[in-house]
């Protein structure tokens, strides 16, 4: 069946910001699908609110709209673009929910838009828990006993029948949001209440518990002709009860018999038919009773999912690409397999290796959060590893996580930790076998399949054997590497340096070989160079070429501070080097990303980003240089070791990296260079820290070196706060000094992305943070161009940056953070790499910043590179292109405004206080573009938490009370209902605002929390008292969140707001911006414009000059 010719234009909905449960895998899927549709000649329109994505690059599609993912904005885009079809299966749960809403509201019918890939009734049947259960029963498949409820009372009735524990699953949600396992009435009430809020349908399924059963997933494909294949079987290492996103998973399934697998395969096919699935990829989850073999179907996702990305990378079968082609009418047997070039997509992949996916957690970023894992996902990222055996793949996965510090385990309560899994689950399992627990004992506590536990026991037993051997024992060393032990682990066992192990290995000839991922277990010759290492093989399948080569190091697992933005930069760097004729080798361990798509680079090595693994690849490939500038902190950390081993690091040598990453050295360098820095001191002990803080004067900012995302940074106001921080952080030592800076209160922070070619300097993006100093730039909203800087100040900033870049002799990208106070510019820090704001800046100015930065690294000159994009808008609206006298090339200054807003997953971590500080906690971002700041900010907020236009609650500290009066007064005049606590209400009332007083918690009923839960509050303005809390205090408050003392009153309001999805503003600056957005919304309807239209209009205006 040929492609459909009645369709010309297809609208693709993205998944929005990166958050827990919906991450970079949807950019990978979207980018693949867009490329596939374009290859068939279709026009493609994309709408997404997330600028940090390859799929929103204007070169990729015919029209890209970075707009809020709401029905109103989608309808506006549809009205303007008039697409023939809408493809909703590539944007996660967000896109599916929007597609259903567009259908129900008649928008698709009104504009004659066809839903392709999946039909509305199919989505309803798959996503509505009750409909799904009925459909499965009707086709003879067993499901878990369950009831759909819409109130706590109904849930209590169901539990009387089922008994505890029960699993609560909200409808139409992702990542298990709002769900959980209830073991008693108190937990039931709390989870059901939260689940009803999280569910768009306001229903939850109460399910009879099968905690401890084995969990499996099948990734399947189906076309219009009912051809069906299984792409990959995936087995969860952890049993039912832990969200699959938080579980270690293994592909292919290891403990299924062939009979069980065929039974599961047939069930999957029946399930697709039962819900009327049209064409594309689908993920189906099963549970199997370990003792009886009973099989039940848990749920299905009628779309490309997180597991689809994993299955694609695990097998080499591009699920998203083929899903898009099936959606427009092709059959599986009409789509060629691009890896073999001999088979078609109708051939089921066959793999002769084992893949392990391991989640990456960052619980330390959310003090006070529930640590126990359950049905609500908590991991922020993941890694994938490939080995010839489970043991080897497991070892590679563990080192891919890049965990710098071994967790402190509570071995005295080890059994309790095994029975109640946390993010440290795997460490406790290793510890259990080190402490001689048997497989049966660990199985009884964890319900993990004995096959997996036996494999781990064998690894731990062999570790004991190694401790009795010498490192030069060939047999032991060879077996250790086959079992997945890293050189670093062996060095710790033998009490020698890692370099010593490497030398012994090479001398004894114990080195890895590289095998190809080919979809067919070598049955056909593969054309695509996609490799993994193994010590369980003889033949090397990678053949190095004689071309000029560059090796690009990826960013590893997504984590807070190092997310999709760095993969975006890496992909652009790869394309830039390829354009200049280089063969590009990509090394990365993250299955969610575009960079690990096999057709992005010339060669892909799916390997851990460690010194050991990079050196082994370099030994074979012999690259001309290694690029560490685009992968965040991960590549920078190993640059020294790579350089020491003779590899050439392009653009940044270790000495320069160490100077900029070492807080004390860099601060001293700035001072010696005559550049302004806040007063500071270096402390190597608690005594020195206390003395330094007293000399500088409180408040002070405390910063360790070599951290990303503000890890372990804090602002402290008093001596007791400082002592609390140091004892809690355990970071200070002679080898790990802390920098104590004077905290610049009320300073304006600037984020600057800059590129240098060694001669000229180009400020690509000058961004102003909306919140004042003290909040990490990754968590603060920012605007480009700045809105409050004078011309003189801008000139001063440009001159300062030029001096700094030239004095450090930087070539390539850098990110500089500045603070402006009383018209004085202070340098806060410099990062010798591309920053997380690169994608945002690229979309804001219409120039691919990462590409330009990459080309300067290989000797290209900025003046020539930027000429291609001239004229671009500058502050002076220049018509002639030439460097300024200072050597600073014209800084882009768009005629429109762009705002970046952070997305923080507080809803996933109940009990966490939402107050922001110098340690980053956001996982993603959204972007708003408008003619003025107010419009851009309004769009950014609509993309994030939304904007309320009905009522607000105000409770602020004494210092902020006068500042809020005109802001609240304006909203009151617009018709907002204003609630306030006593002190704030008194000030507002004295200024003529009719305020409704509310009780604080513990002062009377109904109190402020009651009003929030009753839905009477649209948004909240609550500012922190001048006495800031340290992370230790926030942690203690969270653990004691039911106390009624005054200290926890604000905490209770903020946590209630998160639970009830009420936007909560915690700074005056953000409130001021929110009011400007509300004013703009009241004034007129917000427009929608594609990036192509924006850039074309701006360039046209300039050319007319």
Curated annotation (Swiss-Prot):
Pathway(s) this gene product operates in, as recorded in its UniProt entry: Amino-acid biosynthesis; L-arginine biosynthesis; carbamoyl phosphate from bicarbonate: step 1/1; Pyrimidine metabolism; UMP biosynthesis via de novo pathway; (S)-dihydroorotate from bicarbonate: step 1/3
Cofactor details (free text): Binds 4 Mg(2+) or Mn(2+) ions per subunit.
Protein name per the record: Carbamoyl phosphate synthase large chain
Reactions catalysed: hydrogencarbonate + L-glutamine + 2 ATP + H2O = carbamoyl phosphate + L-glutamate + 2 ADP + phosphate + 2 H(+)
Binding site for Mn(2+) 2: 299, 301
Quaternary data: Composed of two chains; the small (or glutamine) chain promotes the hydrolysis of glutamine to ammonia, which is used by the large (or ammonia) chain to synthesize carbamoyl phosphate. Tetramer of heterodimers (alpha,beta)4.
One Gene Ontology cellular component: cytoplasm
Annotated region described as Carboxyphosphate synthetic domain, given as residue ranges: 1-402
Native organism taxonomy: Bacteria, Thermotogati, Thermotogota, Thermotogae, Thermotogales
List of residues binding Mn(2+) 3: 817, 829
A GO MF label: ATP binding
Originating gene: carB
Binding residues for Mg(2+) 2: 299, 301
Residue positions binding Mg(2+) 4: 829, 831
Residues binding Mn(2+) 4: 829, 831
Protein keywords: Amino-acid biosynthesis, Arginine biosynthesis, ATP-binding, Ligase, Magnesium, Manganese, Metal-binding, Nucleotide-binding, Pyrimidine biosynthesis, Repeat
Protein's job: Large subunit of the glutamine-dependent carbamoyl phosphate synthetase (CPSase). CPSase catalyzes the formation of carbamoyl phosphate from the ammonia moiety of glutamine, carbonate, and phosphate donated by ATP, constituting the first step of 2 biosynthetic pathways, one leading to arginine and/or urea and the other to pyrimidine nucleotides.
Native organism: Pseudothermotoga lettingae (strain ATCC BAA-301 / DSM 14385 / NBRC 107922 / TMO) (Thermotoga lettingae)
MGS-like domain: residues covered: 940-1101
Binding positions for Mg(2+) 1 per the UniProt entry: 285, 299
Domain ATP-grasp: 133-328, 667-858
């Amino acid at each position: 069946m040929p492609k459909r010719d009645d369709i010309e234009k297809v609208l693709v909905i993205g998944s929005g910001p990166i958050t827990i449960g919906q991450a970079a895998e949807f950019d990978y899927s979207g980018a693949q699908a867009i490329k596939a549709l374009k290859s068939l000649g279709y026009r493609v329109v994309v709408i997404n609110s997330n600028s940090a994505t390859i799929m929103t690059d204007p070169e990729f599609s015919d029209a890209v709209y970075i707009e809020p993912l709401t029905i109103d904005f989608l309808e506006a885009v549809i009205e303007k673009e008039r697409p023939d079809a809408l493809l909703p299966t590539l944007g996660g749960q967000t896109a599916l929910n929007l597609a259903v809403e567009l259908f129900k509201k008649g928008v698709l019918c009104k504009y004659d838009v066809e839903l392709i890939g999946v039909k509305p009734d199919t989505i309803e049947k798959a996503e509505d828990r009750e409909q799904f259960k009925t459909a499965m029963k009707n086709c003879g498949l067993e499901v878990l006993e369950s009831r759909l409820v819409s109130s706590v009372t109904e849930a209590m009735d169901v539990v009387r029948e089922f008994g505890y524990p029960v699993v609560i699953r909200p409808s139409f949600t992702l990542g298990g949001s709002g769900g959980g396992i209830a073991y008693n009435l108190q937990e039931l009430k709390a989870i059901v209440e939260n689940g009803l809020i999280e569910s768009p349908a306001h229903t939850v399924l109460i399910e009879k518990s099968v905690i401890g059963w084995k969990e499996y997933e099948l990734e399947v494909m189906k076309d219009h002709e009912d051809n069906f294949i299984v792409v990959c079987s995936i087995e969860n290492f952890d049993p039912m009860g832990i969200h699959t996103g938080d579980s270690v998973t293994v592909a292919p399934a290891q403990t299924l018999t062939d009979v069980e697998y065929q039974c599961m395969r047939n069930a999957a096919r029946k399930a697709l038919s039962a819900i009327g699935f049209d064409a594309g990829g689908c993920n189906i989850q099963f549970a199997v009773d370990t003792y009886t073999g009973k099989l039940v179907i848990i749920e299905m996702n009628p779309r490309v999912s997180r597991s689809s990305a994993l299955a694609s990378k695990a097998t080499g079968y591009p699920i998203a690409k083929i899903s898009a082609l099936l959606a427009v009418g092709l059959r599986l047997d009409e789509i060629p397999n691009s890896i073999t070039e001999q088979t078609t997509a109708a051939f089921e992949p066959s793999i002769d290796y084992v893949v392990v996916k391991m989640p990456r957690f960052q619980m330390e970023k959310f003090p006070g959060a529930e640590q126990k894992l359950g049905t609500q996902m908590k991991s922020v990222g993941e890694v994938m590893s490939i080995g010839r055996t489970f043991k080897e793949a497991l070892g590679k996965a563990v080192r891919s996580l890049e965990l710098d510090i071994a967790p402190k385990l509570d071995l005295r309560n080890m059994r309790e930790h095994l029975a109640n899994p946390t993010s440290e689950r795997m460490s406790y399992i290793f510890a259990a076998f080190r402490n001689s627990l048997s497989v049966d004992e660990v199985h009884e506590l964890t319900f993990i399949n004995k096959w997996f536990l036996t494999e781990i026991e064998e690894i731990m037993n062999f570790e004991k054997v190694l401790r009795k051997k010498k490192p030069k024992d060939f047999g032991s060393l060879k077996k250790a590497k086959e079992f997945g032990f890293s050189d670093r682990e062996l060095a710790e066992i033998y009490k020698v340096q890692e370099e010593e192990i490497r030398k012994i290995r090479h001398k004894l000839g114990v080195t890895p070989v590289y095998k190809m991922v080919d979809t067919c277990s070598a049955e056909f010759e593969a054309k695509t160079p996609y490799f993994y290492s193994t010590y369980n093989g003889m033949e090397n399948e990678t053949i190095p070429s004689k071309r000029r080569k560059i090796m690009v190091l990826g960013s590893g697992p997504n984590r807070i501070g190092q997310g999709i933005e760095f993969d975006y930069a890496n992909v652009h760097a790869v394309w830039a080097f390829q354009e200049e004729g280089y063969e590009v080798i990509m090394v990365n361990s993250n299955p969610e990303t575009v960079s690990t798509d096999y057709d992005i680079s010339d060669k892909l090595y799916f390997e851990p980003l460690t010194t050991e693994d990079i050196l082994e690849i370099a030994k074979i490939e012999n690259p001309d240089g290694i690029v560490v500038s685009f992968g965040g902190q991960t590549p920078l950390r190993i640059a020294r070791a790579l350089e020491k081993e003779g590899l050439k690091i392009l653009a940044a040598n270790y000495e320069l990296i160490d100077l900029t990453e070492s807080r004390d050295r860099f601060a001293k360098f700035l001072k010696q260079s005559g550049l302004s820095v806040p007063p500071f001191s270096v402390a190597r002990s608690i005594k020195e820290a206390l003395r330094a803080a007293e000399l500088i004067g409180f408040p002070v900012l405390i910063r360790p070196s070599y951290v990303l995302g503000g890890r372990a940074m804090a602002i402290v106001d008093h001596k007791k706060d400082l002592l609390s921080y140091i004892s809690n952080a355990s970071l200070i030592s002679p080898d790990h000094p802390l920098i104590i800076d004077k905290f610049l209160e009320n300073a304006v922070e600037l984020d600057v992305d800059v590129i240098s070619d060694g001669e000229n300097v180009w400020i690509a993006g000058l961004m102003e943070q909306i919140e004042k100093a003290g909040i990490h730039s990754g968590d603060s909203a920012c605007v480009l161009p700045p809105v409050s800087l004078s011309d003189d100040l801008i000139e001063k900033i440009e001159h300062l940056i030029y001096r700094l870049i030239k004095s450090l002799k930087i070539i390539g990208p850098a990110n500089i953070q500045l603070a402006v106070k009383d018209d004085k510019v202070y340098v806060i820090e410099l990062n010798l790499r591309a920053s997380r704001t690169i994608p945002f800046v690229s979309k804001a100015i219409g120039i691919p910043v990462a590409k330009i930065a990459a080309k300067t690294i290989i000797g290209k000159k900025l003046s020539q590179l930027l000429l291609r994009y001239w004229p671009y808008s500058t502050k002076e609206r220049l018509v002639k292109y030439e460097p300024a006298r200072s050597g600073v090339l014209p800084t882009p200054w768009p005629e429109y405004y762009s705002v970046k807003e952070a997305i923080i997953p507080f809803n996933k971590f109940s009990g966490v206080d939402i107050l922001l500080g110098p340690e980053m906690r956001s996982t993603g971002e959204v972007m708003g573009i408008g003619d003025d700041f107010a419009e851009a900010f309004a769009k950014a907020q609509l993309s994030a938490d939304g904007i309320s236009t009905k009522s607000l609650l105000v409770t602020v500290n004494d210092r902020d009370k006068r500042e809020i009066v005109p802001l609240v007064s304006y909203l009151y005049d617009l018709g907002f209902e204003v609630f306030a606590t006593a002190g704030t209400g008194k000030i507002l009332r004295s200024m003529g605002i009719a305020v409704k007083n509310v009780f604080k918690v513990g002062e009377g009923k109904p109190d402020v929390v009651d009003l929030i839960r009753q839905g009477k509050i649209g948004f909240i303005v609550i500012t922190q008292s001048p006495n800031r809390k340290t992370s230790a205090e926030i942690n203690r408050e969270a653990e004691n969140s039911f106390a009624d003392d005054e200290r926890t009153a604000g905490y209770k309001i903020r946590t209630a707001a998160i639970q009830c999805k009420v936007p909560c503003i915690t700074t005056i600056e953000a409130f001021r911006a929110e009011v400007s957005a509300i004013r703009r919304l009241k004034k007129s309807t917000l427009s929608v414009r594609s990036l192509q239209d924006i850039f074309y209009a701006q360039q046209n205006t300039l050319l007319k000059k």
